[in-house]
Every structure is written in structure tokens, then in C-alpha cells.
Amino acid sequence: MASVIGFYSLNFGLFISLIIVFFSIKNFRNENIFDDKILSFTFLQFIFVVVSFLGLIISFVNSDFSNETVFNHSHTTIPLFYKITGTWGNHEGSLLLWLLVLTLFILLFLLKSKEQYKRYRILTLLFQQIIIIGFFIFLIKTSNPFSYIFPVPNEGLGLNPILQDPALAIHPPILYLGYVGSSIIFSATLSATSLNYISSKWAKHIKGWVSLSWIFLTLGILLGSIWAYYELGWGGFWFWDPVENVSLMPWLALTTLFHFILILERKLIFTSWVIILSISTFTLSMIGTFLV
């Protein structure tokens, strides 16, 4: 039942995304003030994704092996903590987590940017909704975390023992907070560029998102390094493995971007570099998500 609710919530969330796009385009063209219906629908979108994610967690906790994702990545004897963290210890669950953070961050962006230019807020929302809709469709069509198995197995295959570690259990959510933060920076930069809105005021506004993303990405990489040190036996915290490097690249781009944002906040220069680095950070974050 939890899986069924989760799947339908995912579909309702996609439908709400299309409604948000419709009202956003209408508001962008015709009105001088921000339409509060857009914020309400964005909140509703977030709620549907929360329900969907909770549905997957409940399926893991209850060892619902009619769910293919649960069957492939859980077992009745696994401790409760790892049943919960097993939710994102797989491709489908991790993408659903991505989507959850995406919808949370765009909601926070709208709540925290009320003093910004209306068209800038709406255009940022539209760019972000394109990404969100892409994740909805990808999850529903190709990486459905709620796929059904029949006949229902009595037991699951279990979670990879390497993943049954406290550091790695919290590593993906923290890393994804950094990754997804780069999407807000990306959408906001495209919006500001399109509207010729890049300024010192804008730099001060977006600096918070850059800082937040950098902090989470740094913590995520640090936790992954600690785990690799004692779990994989590489003999060090960093082995220049492709899995490590793929998270390092957006971190380097984000670190550079942060310095350019600090300069832009004081003087209107290096705008081209800010645009290039914003796009690069998000692109590298997407590569890091789908490559690992």
C-alpha cells in the first residue's frame, strides 16, 4: 500500500509541476506582482514528493518485497537504521532523494527571495521546474522506485555490506544537498543573465546559496573520505578514485565561484566567469549523480 501511495504521489507531483509552469508563464507575462498561487502549488509539489519518499521508506521498514527496489536492497534481518538508509542506497531511491531536495530548495528560494525582482523569481522557478519535471519523468518512466514484483518473494537480496556503515549512511543526503544547491545557483544565474539582473545586490542574494552548497558538498566529500579510509583499505583518505574525483570537480568549480561572487558583490566585474562557473558546477554535479 505504501508503494502504491508513493507511486501515485510521484505522478501527482508531476501534474502539479505542469500547473506551476502554466501559472508561472501567465504571471511572468501579465502581472506586476507575484501570484501567491504559485507558492501554494510549489508547497503542494513538495508535499507530494515527501509523501512519495515516505512511501519508499515505509516499504523498506516493513520489508515489502513486492517492491522491486526493496527486494534488491533490503532483507528482514537488516537493522532498522540500515533499512531506512537503504532507501537512498540505490539508484532509484537516490534519484527520489534528489527530487525531494530539488522541490525543497525551490520552495525555500521563493520564500527567501521576496525582496527580489518578480520576473527574476518566476524565471528562476521556471528553469528549476524544467529540471524537476525531467527528474519526475525519468523516475516514473525509467527508474521507478515503486516497481511491483509478482509473485512476491519471501526474502530480499539484502543491502551491500559495504554500504552498511554510519558514515556512508548519511554521506549521500549531505552530498546531494550540495549537488542540488548548485541547481538553484544555475537556474538563478540563467534567470539573472536573461533579465540583465546581475548586480552587487544579486551577488549578495545568491552568495547564501553558494555558501550553503559549498558547506554541504565539503561535508559530503569529507564523510566519504573517512568511510573510504577504514572501509575500503586504500591506505589513505584520498585515492584519486573516479568516484572521489567526480565529487571533487564540482567542489573545485563551486569554490572558485564563491570567490568570484565575493568580488562581484563589491565590484561589477567577472560576470562572465560567474555565469560559466555556475553552469559548470551544476553540469559537474549532474555528472557526479548519474555516473556513480
Where is each model-derived feature located?
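Polytopic transmembrane helical bundles with strong interfacial aromatic enrichment
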Residues: 1-292
